[in-house]
Amino acid sequence: MAGPEPEPVSSAAATTPAPSAPVVLPKTSESDQLLKIRHSMSHVMAMAVQQLFPKARVTIGPWTETGFYYDFDNPDPFTEADLKAIKKGMIKIINKKLPLQRVEVSRNEAEEKIKAQNEPYKLEILQGLHEPITLYTLGEDWWDLCAGPHVDHTGQLNAKAFELESLAGAYWRGDETKAQLQRIYGTAWESPEQLAEHKRRKEEALRRDHRRIGKDLDLFSIEDEAGAGLVFWHPRGARIRLLIEEFWRQAHFEGGYELLYTPHVADISLWKTSGHLDFYAESMFGPMEVDEREYQLKPMNCPFHVLTYASKLRSYRELPIRWAELGTVYRYERPGVMHGLMRVRGFTQDDAHVFCLPEQISDEILKILDLTERILSAFDFSNYEINLSTRPEKSIGEDAVWDLATKGLIEALERKGWAYKIDEGGGAFYGPKIDLKIEDAIGRMWQCSTIQLDFNLPERFELDYIAADGSKQRPIMIHRAIFGSLERFFGIMTENYAGDYPFWLAPEQVRLLPVTDEVQPYAEQLLDQLTKAGVRATVDRSGDRLGKLIRTGEQMKIPVLAVIGAKEAEQNAVSLRSRRDGDLGVTAVSDLLSAAQMANSERAAGLELNR
């Protein structure tokens, strides 16, 4: 598989002392103290770096959800040995209990201080700031442009509760045409126990890395010859994807949706009308000329659904119209941000668009929330974090429509009984939205589902319907994606299960292990029975000893291993070993078939055998 390999799992998880009771790790965004600790740690690190490397120029150093980082412009690359020296320098600064003090200065004063320190990046940052300019001093000699907040002094930082974790490359302002910088990542917590728990979770995250699992289980690859960010689904991964798609289609049909299939390319004029060329061109692949017309790969499915709506006259009696598509889109992603299945250049979105009347908004949003819960819970995601983003200062659309749409979203969430936070002014310029994050098995939150109202595309494409009074009116358009993209969801799901997929979703559900050549015909006969019953089964024909057959099956995370010896063949039975339930003993073939079919129909995690 091309691209960077996941980090090796170290022995740190085993050597880090585990806390005696479960440690709840606070989130930076929800803990003022943790935010101050991490923000202050980034300053302490920058000070230590400049003490050790006087030629290093500082840029920015924010807090993150698990720690902090700082970007430096240094003539020589930092090394792992440098990180150790920097950490020692940080501990010295912490032990000195140096004060962190907020100072307001004029633009001219700030400019003079920056020039005196020869900090060109800070000078550029200053140009974008409004007076009064704030900076924070650390001790008497070191300072940084910053709005805060910070701890009162470095003695409030725990020298045993932080770590410098890694080095990475970065570009100034995230622009590949600008200076390449060196980023140092760190983590900081309130206590050593929290740090130990963070390390444990990090090791667990490495064990669950979907790139490693994808390679070990032969699920997918990304091939250099084809290009970066383009996914090759191998048979086992394709089987899982097919199961996801089949469930998704069934749920949508039952939810009152119809399916669409739309082209992968369109005339460039479509992207002009939709506004993508004005606002999204940097994320689109370049045009191609065919028969003297310019075409571009689609970055989104929305304009195609809009054209389908506009293909005939619509009546209010038809609304709501619900259309869904598993549509593959193509977006340019910079080389440095692509990551396994999580960030790719070609991916399949589970897009749906609802065209409805204004008074139908609340009911339609509630139906979408119900469908979202049904689909996500089938993959064992049941804890959600929900944000409702409202009208920004710059927006399009009438006040009454915005108010009605926002009220409809709130009403639907209230009717659903889901807790949510309001992000005032955080909506898109063309409509309010709901964002839903899912929590995985190790407590990480992943952005997943989006429900977005759109007042822009109906206006740009002049969509309408004939109202009850015979007038033409604009429909309300709701964008909606539950998975976000199949590729990204597949990666999240794989890490959530650590590759141990539930029985109904496993690419290979049962592996038959014939102990001798004499029982091989019986194994082949049983394979035929299982396959015809809709069970995904194989026979291990390697001829290896039983111990190795079992180890190989366990390494491939097969849910059920069926050992076949002479006794089992005589009894028309198998000896079952389950990853979930252990040794299940000798089981009649008829019972295995019934249990497997039941597990598939109920989308169950394992077999329920009648004993």
Curated annotation (Swiss-Prot):
PANTHER family reported in the protein's UniProt record: THREONINE--TRNA LIGASE, CHLOROPLASTIC_MITOCHONDRIAL 2, THREONINE-TRNA LIGASE
Name of the featured protein: Threonine--tRNA ligase
Lineage per the UniProt record: Bacteria, Bacillati, Cyanobacteriota, Cyanophyceae, Synechococcales
Note describing how the cofactor binds: Binds 1 zinc ion per subunit.
Subunit structure: Homodimer.
Function of the molecule: Catalyzes the attachment of threonine to tRNA(Thr) in a two-step reaction: L-threonine is first activated by ATP to form Thr-AMP and then transferred to the acceptor end of tRNA(Thr). Also edits incorrectly charged L-seryl-tRNA(Thr).
Example GO molecular function: metal ion binding
Region (Catalytic): 209-502
UniProt-listed Enzyme Commission number(s): 6.1.1.3
Species this protein is from: Synechococcus sp. (strain CC9605)
Biased composition (Low complexity): 8-24
Stretch list, region Disordered: 1-27
GO BP terms, alphabetized: threonyl-tRNA aminoacylation
Gene Ontology cellular-component terms listed: cytoplasm
Alphabetic keyword roster: Aminoacyl-tRNA synthetase, ATP-binding, Cytoplasm, Ligase, Metal-binding, Nucleotide-binding, Protein biosynthesis, RNA-binding, tRNA-binding, Zinc
Coiled-coil zones: none
Record's keyword annotation contains Ligase: yes
Primary localization: cytoplasm
Localization: Cytoplasm
Cofactor: Zn(2+)
PROSITE patterns: AA_TRNA_LIGASE_II
UniProt record similarity statement: Belongs to the class-II aminoacyl-tRNA synthetase family.
Swiss-Prot/TrEMBL catalytic activity: tRNA(Thr) + L-threonine + ATP = L-threonyl-tRNA(Thr) + AMP + diphosphate + H(+)
Residues binding Zn(2+): 302, 353, 479
